[in-house]
Curated annotation (Swiss-Prot):
Highest taxon listed in the record's lineage: Eukaryota
Annotated organism of origin: Saccharomyces cerevisiae (strain ATCC 204508 / S288c)
Protein name per UniProt: Putative uncharacterized protein YHR032C-A
Misc. remarks from the entry: Partially overlaps YHR032W-A.
Length: 39
């Protein structure tokens, strides 16, 4: 169960790594829901 929970966290808060610097993007989780709003 822990693995599944961790996977969800990774999808919600993806980590963008480049040149040894990792940035956590928690905004992706919040942006994902509004983007699916019916237009």
């Amino acid at each position: 169960m822990k693995g599944s929970k961790l996977f969800q966290m990774q999808k919600c808060m993806p980590v963008w790594c480049r040149t040894g610097t990792c940035i956590i993007l928690p905004v992706a989780c919040h942006m994902a829901k509004p983007l699916k709003l019916p237009t």
